[in-house]
Regions:
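Glycine-rich phosphate/nucleotide-binding loop
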Residues: 45-48, 90, 234-334
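Generic secondary-structure signature for well-ordered alpha-helical cores
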Residues: 26, 30-34, 65-68, 101-108, ...
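Extreme N-terminal starter segment of soluble prokaryotic enzymes
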Residues: 1-5
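N-terminal beta-loop-helix "entrance" segment that forms/cooperates
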Residues: 33-57, 231-233
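Buried hydrophobic positions in well-ordered alpha/beta secondary-structure cores of metabolic enzymes
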Residues: 11-14, 67, 138, 179, ...
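N-terminal glycine-rich phosphate/adenylate-binding segment common to multiple enzyme folds
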Residues: 49-162, 248
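Glycine-rich phosphate/pyrophosphate-binding loop and the adjoining helix
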Residues: 142-143, 147-186, 190-191, 196-198, ...
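Glycine-rich phosphate/diphosphate-binding loop of Rossmann-like nucleotide-binding domains
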Residues: 6-23, 28-29, 155-227, 239
Length: 360
């Protein structure tokens, strides 16, 4: 099979980590009879330098015409880069918002995996994490409080601010379907997180999620209030498989989940919509302070590529192979500087990529 991938290397360490992900994909393609065709597209600061825009219409059209999009990282040093003297809509990160909107991506998936080999980097006690954990946070991206009507006014000399939280049942239904589909490929458990004891929007969320669950009888659905979920993530993270939640709750919980894994350099991310076309990227930033020094950890980007194979291309075996290769390299004691510990072997970006390829 041939697959067309729009590659947005972006800024900082983006080109380095994307190079390693492409090498891994090419190895998988060679082993399993696939051909991955890459079209390089400018995004973020490099696009601003070349075109004056963080994402051009032409770049967006290329992305729309591809089977998937693989992104490195966007942005620079806020205190030093001229990009941040520009209006907000012309800054690097605006390109990311633009492509999510342009591709109608409404679901963000962030896996939170603690590999057994990296337990020492986890801030939680060993008796809590055991042999590690593996769950995903699925966050709705385009509705809720962040996109509702807002205002700030002064009434009788008193300042007053209002934000509006709105969801309709179609918005809830489409992301709930994604959560159940992903659970079918994992542990077949969905935990829907809300604040249904207080919020009408959460009560609707809970109702619609239960309706969708009827189409997935193999998947176990549970409901959890968001404050309890925040506690359970640090008390017993192993209980979770797929956490489904709305925009603001997901924003907070996914960051909490990322911290208990020990290193953000290990965390992949996917943004999905109604079609198989998705945006795959590491959760970390562009790290301009180490750009070009062969120090960046490419694993999050490589794992993002594995997610692309699984969710956009339905190549489950190939995705599993990449993830197993990452685990094998970690088990042998190889580490980039961000996850380095005593007794391990320090390697650079390129070397880590080569080691993972050798295990495929």
């Amino acid at each position: 099979m041939n697959y067309n991938i729009a590659v947005m290397s972006g800024d900082g360490i983006g080109p380095e980590i994307i190079t390693e992900a492409k090498k891994v994909l090419d190895k998988v393609g060679s082993n399993y009879g696939h051909k991955f065709n890459y079209t390089e597209v400018l995004m973020g600061g490099v696009s601003i330098d070349a075109t004056g825009e963080p994402l051009t219409k032409e770049a967006l059209e290329i992305a729309k015409g591809s089977d998937s999009v693989l992104l490195g990282a966007v942005g620079g040093d806020v205190g030093k880069s001229n990009w941040y003297s520009l209006p907000p809509h012309l800054r690097p990160e605006a390109g990311l918002l633009a492509i999510r909107k342009g591709l109608n991506l409404f679901a963000n998936i962030r896996p939170a995996i603690l590999f057994d080999e990296l337990k020492g980097a986890c801030p939680l006690k060993e008796e809590i994490v055991g042999s590690g954990f593996d769950f995903v946070v699925m966050r709705e991206l385009t509705g809720g409080l962040y996109f509702g009507e807002r205002s700030t006014v002064e009434e009788n000399g008193v300042r007053k601010a209002t934000d509006t939280l709105v969801y309709d049942e179609n918005e809830v239904r489409r992301i709930a379907k994604w959560a159940f589909e992903i659970a079918m490929k994992r542990g077949k458990k969905v935990c829907s997180v809300d604040k249904a004891n207080v919020l009408d929007s959460s009560r609707l969320w809970r109702q619609v999620t239960k309706e969708v669950s009827k189409d997935y009888p193999e998947v176990e659905l549970s409901d959890m209030l968001v404050d309890n979920c925040a506690m359970q993530l640090v008390k017993n993270p192993k209980q979770f498989d797929v956490i489904l939640t709305e925009n603001m709750f997901g924003d907070i919980l996914s960051d909490e989940a990322s911290m208990i894994t020990g290193s953000i350099g290990m965390l992949a991310s996917a943004s999905l919509g109604d079609t198989k076309l998705g945006l795959y990227e590491p959760s970390h930033g562009s790290a301009p302070d180490i750009a070009g020094q062969n120090k960046a950890n490419p694993i999050a980007t490589i794992l993002s590529a594995a997610m692309m194979l699984r969710y956009s291309f339905d190549l489950e075996v190939e995705a599993d192979k990449i993830e197993a290769a990452v685990k094998a390299v970690l088990k042998k004691g190889y580490r980039t500087i961000d996850i380095m510990s005593e007794g391990m072997t320090l390697v650079g970006t390129k070397e880590m990529g080569d080691l993972i390829i050798s295990e495929i």
